[in-house]
Amino acid sequence: MSRRLISTAALLVLTAAPAHAEVKSATPGGFEVGGSVAINAPPARVWTALTAPDDWWSRDHRWFKGSTLSLDLAPGGCWCEQAQDGRVSRHLETALVEPGSKLVLRGGLGPLQGQGASGGLTFDLKAEGAGSVLTWSYIVGGYTPGGLEGWAAPVDNVLSAQLANLKTRVEAAD
């Protein structure tokens, strides 16, 4: 193989996106973002990690410095952030759990909490070969001054980054 071909192949491997994500639609009344990520681990291990968000959700995308995230999988359970000084935020609420395969959460992530908007965040997990594919979507509707379409790309970027963190965390457990 030529040195140039090897260099090109190495560059492609190093720059390959860990997840496929996109803004599927965006209007003043709402948006849909989503994608999928292939994870080199069995679904059971991915599920365990997915349901422990404190281990993979970036500390740069939390309300409170030094906070912890928890997820109660009971219906109506809280994806909550707790600061050491007692401050707490209920980011999402558990709507549906199919252990090992599907998780649906409802609510407004981040600054959407203070808007007249809410959404459904769905994770579908399937085995693929020796690994897994995690497909996700976040569908948001409601009202905010200036419309919701401008929120779609930033929300997609944040969620895509978090799921890349999840992939890295799960695959590093080998």
Locate the predicted segments by residue.
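Bacterial N-terminal signal peptides that target proteins for export
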Residues: 1-8
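Cleavable N-terminal signal peptides
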Residues: 8-9, 19
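Hydrophobic ligand-binding cavity/cleft-lining segments
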Residues: 19-66
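Hydrophobic/aromatic beta-strand elements that line small-molecule binding cavities or substrate pockets
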Residues: 35-37, 69, 90-96, 119-127
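A short, structured loop/turn motif at beta-sheet edges
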Residues: 40-45, 95-102, 124-133, 168-174
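A mature extracytoplasmic/lumenal domain signature
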Residues: 43, 50-52, 83-85, 96-98, ...
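Short beta-edge strand/loop motif at the mouth of beta-sheet-based domains
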Residues: 54-91
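Beta-strand/loop substructures that line and gate deep hydrophobic ligand-binding cavities in soluble
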Residues: 110-157
